[in-house]
């Protein structure tokens, strides 16, 4: 039983690539889909990268999980290969106490892939300063891939720029790096609008960039600070206060702890920068990490919402920790306040858990898989992606049952209220709902036929 609804979407897309070469149906939200292809919100590139180690693990429920073990191991090896044992120990201690990055590795989301790319960027950027051959290409390639997957990853180009700067070829290298960054962002934005399904209710807010494109710079600045202020108010009222008082939902606690950890890391790195300045030691890496972390943090609050900190804060913590551990053993002092955060507020360390096996759920999933596979076998020559897509009533049925879909089928993650409304068109051939729900009532009124029925869900098939 998965603990995150995103995990099943990653898994089924990866299974589609490994078994069929790509999704035969559509992945999307509320009956939406990409302009080109059938991939979900994150687009195809993340899934294609996971397919590289994925060929070793097949199309099972835990394929993404095992791929994350590979990316986690590669992250450690790439980042620590040039560090002495003292810095490795400081990094390991900080990593354990930070907890969020470690926890993300033991999931089936895509964060460990970004951890690996981050390790490549930082390790090879530092190698650039030592004149290591091939380091520039490796660092820039990782920056390009990270930016294509997540547009705000463009800030990571700052590391190869700063570490690779040399007086005799600095301008030429800078021009090439900036050009690569710009092309990566443009391609990433094109891919988001073309190769990925639209976001649902948690849409990206590009109002700032829209106003700037219209020449309304004062309006863009005003909107930025207005949105930032609203996000900060929400962060305090909706996340920090409930967590401090106890009894908050787990996703609220996760977001609050993510914010507290990022804040602690940034304050510590800033203090180390001041200390190193007094001691006349280099601070370029730590300054770069602060700039990148602050930029991404603001992007999350202004373009997304504070809730996204429950996931993306792990990347920010790891970014700050990696740079500090590679340059300064004093980062080990972070372990004390980080350990305090593990147990207060809300006993964060004791609420985590790996996905659990549920025998009853597994038996129902077997029935769903067999029924859908038999139905799909009759449609092998059908080219319409909607004929290979199932609409899921989110809120009525546990998303873990979606693992039962045969490899290649697409998933429309629809709200139960969306499916229950007769005004909304259902394009998919199949719909998964629960018993005695408004969504099921609509399907019955429209003459949909039961394909398979179990204790906790029913799959309906479009009437012929």
Segments predicted by a language model, with ranges:
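Short acidic/glycine- and proline-prone juxtamembrane loop motifs at membrane-interface regions
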Residues: 4, 103-113
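Extracytosolic helix-loop segments that constitute the early lumenal/periplasmic catalytic or substrate-binding loops
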Residues: 9-36, 45
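Loop-to-helix entry region of an early transmembrane alpha helix in multi-pass inner-membrane enzymes
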Residues: 40, 44-74, 254-263, 352
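Signature aromatic-anchored transmembrane alpha helix within multi-pass, membrane-resident enzymes
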Residues: 89-90, 137-141, 178-183, 321, ...
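Membrane-lumen/periplasm interface segments of specific transmembrane helices
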Residues: 173-265
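Membrane-embedded, lumen/periplasm-facing catalytic core of multi-pass transferases
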Residues: 337-400, 404-406
């Amino acid at each position: 039983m998965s603990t995150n609804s995103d995990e099943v979407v990653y898994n089924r897309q990866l299974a589609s690539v490994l078994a069929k070469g790509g999704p035969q149906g559509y992945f999307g939200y509320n009956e939406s889909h990409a302009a080109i292809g059938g991939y979900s919100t994150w687009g195809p590139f993340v899934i294609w990268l996971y397919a590289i180690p994925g060929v070793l693990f097949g199309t099972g429920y835990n394929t993404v999980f095992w791929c994350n073990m590979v990316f986690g191991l590669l992250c450690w090896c790439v980042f620590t290969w040039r560090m002495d044992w003292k810095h490795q120990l400081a990094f390991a201690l900080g990593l354990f106490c930070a907890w969020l990055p470690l926890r993300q590795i033991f999931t089936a989301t895509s964060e460990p892939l970004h951890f690996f790319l981050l390790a490549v960027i930082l390790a090879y950027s530092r190698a650039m300063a030592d004149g290591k051959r091939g380091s520039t290409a490796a660092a820039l390639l990782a920056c390009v891939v990270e930016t294509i997957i997540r547009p705000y990853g463009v800030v990571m180009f700052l590391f190869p720029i700063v570490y690779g700067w040399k007086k005799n070829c600095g301008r030429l290298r800078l021009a090439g790096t900036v050009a690569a960054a710009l092309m990566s962002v443009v391609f990433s934005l094109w891919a988001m609008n073309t190769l990925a399904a639209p976001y649902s209710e948690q849409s990206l807010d590009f109002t700032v960039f829209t106003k700037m494109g219209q020449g309304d710079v004062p309006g863009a600045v005003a909107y930025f600070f207005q949105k930032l202020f609203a996000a900060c108010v929400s962060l305090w009222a909706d996340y920090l206060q409930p967590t401090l008082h106890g009894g908050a939902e787990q996703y609220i606690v996760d977001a609050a702890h993510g914010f507290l950890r990022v804040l602690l890391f940034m304050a510590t790195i800033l203090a180390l920068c001041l200390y190193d300045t007094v001691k006349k030691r280099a601070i370029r890496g730590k300054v770069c990490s602060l700039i990148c972390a602050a930029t991404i943090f603001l992007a999350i609050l202004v373009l997304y919402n504070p809730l996204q900190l429950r996931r993306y804060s792990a990347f920010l913590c790891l970014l700050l920790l990696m740079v500090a551990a590679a340059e300064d053993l004093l980062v080990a002092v972070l372990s004390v306040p980080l350990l305090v955060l593990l147990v207060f507020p809300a006993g964060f360390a004791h609420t985590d858990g790996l996905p659990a096996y549920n025998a009853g759920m597994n038996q129902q999933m077997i029935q769903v898989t067999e029924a859908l596979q038999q139905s799909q076998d009759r449609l092998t020559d059908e080219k319409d992606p909607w004929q290979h897509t199932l609409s899921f009533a989110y809120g009525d049925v546990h998303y873990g049952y979606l693992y039962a879909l045969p490899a290649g089928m697409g998933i429309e993650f629809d709200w139960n209220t969306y499916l229950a409304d007769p005004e909304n068109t259902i394009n998919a051939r199949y719909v998964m709902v629960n018993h005695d729900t408004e969504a099921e009532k609509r399907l019955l009124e429209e003459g949909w036929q039961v394909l398979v029925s179990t204790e906790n869900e029913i799959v309906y098939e479009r009437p012929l």
